Amino acid sequence: MKTRLFTIFLFIFSFSLVFAGGSKEADNSRNNEVVIYAYDSFCSEWGPGPAIVKAFEEKTGYKVTMISAGDAAQVLSKATFEKANPKSDVLIGIDNNLLDKAKSQNILESYKPQNADALIDSNLILDSEWFLSPFDWSSFAMIFDSYANVPAPTCLSDLTKDIYKKKIILMDPRTSTPGLGFVAWTLAEYGLDGIEDFWKALKPNILTMAPGWDTGYGLFTSGEAPLVISYTTSPAYHIYDGEDYRYVALEFEKGHPMQIEGAGLVKNAKNPEGGKAFLDFLISKEAQEIIPETQW
């Protein structure tokens, strides 16, 4: 598994994301404040973050500062840049494809939340050391706009056909976990011998490589292209929101790898006890009941 993930990062090509440092630390203690770095859609007004934070604050008395740091890979990069003087207590969104990179940067502290054995299915546990606590999961899928004037593809190789020229929206695998997940999907299907040829054939059909899911999916629903990488659960949002069945999660014969999103305690966090309390709450029934209707 580690070899495959290393290969994925090599395929993407080496890079360094540099973020400006966070706001000046006002107080070294801040015992009552929990600082969380999370990805854009988690923090948005329609995402689960605001409701989870509100419920946590009301239950525990902690004050939460939730900072949107881009997509999940950017959350990881920001925390890595600050690791000599961490400004966050909890990172949200580091997934199974980013776990090894996060561990190699030594930015996470092992912590197993209270009641984890009772609340978390053993199949979802990301690592035995509990550097990450799983809180959300779904399988990747291509989402298709059924109103489009092109037929729905039935497999990954179909995506390389001329009929889909400039009709596919993907996410940058350097900054986006869906983008990285799609690369992992193609590697699993084509292997090292075939992945380069697949991507060369796919390139003319890519409208854009968006920096994150939020931007990419927004372009898709704006009608910029009829295909986007997302999750099997994405169409349910539109139905829940009172829309019709326009958007369809395509079921291919192979693939659809699962993404398991985790949250972790930052190593040398300024408020580790507050961070632990938040992780305890994030896997609780109260928090988990918020996620299905806010995290699609």
Segments (PLM) and residue ranges:
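Short, polar/charged alpha-helical segment
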Residues: 35-65
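A bilobed periplasmic-binding-protein/Venus flytrap-type ligand-binding module shared by bacterial periplasmic
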Residues: 141-148, 259-274, 290-291
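Extracytoplasmic ligand-binding site segments that recognize negatively charged/polar headgroups
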Residues: 37-49, 70-74, 86-225
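A ligand-binding cleft/hinge motif common to bilobed small-molecule-binding domains
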Residues: 97-101, 221, 225-246, 295
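Periplasmic-binding protein-like
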Residues: 138, 166-175, 199-203, 209-210, 242-267, 281-296
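Short amphipathic alpha-helical coupling segments at ligand-binding clamshell hinges
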Residues: 52, 155, 194-198, 270-282, ...
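Short, low-complexity disordered leader/linker segments with a strong preference
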Residues: 1-34
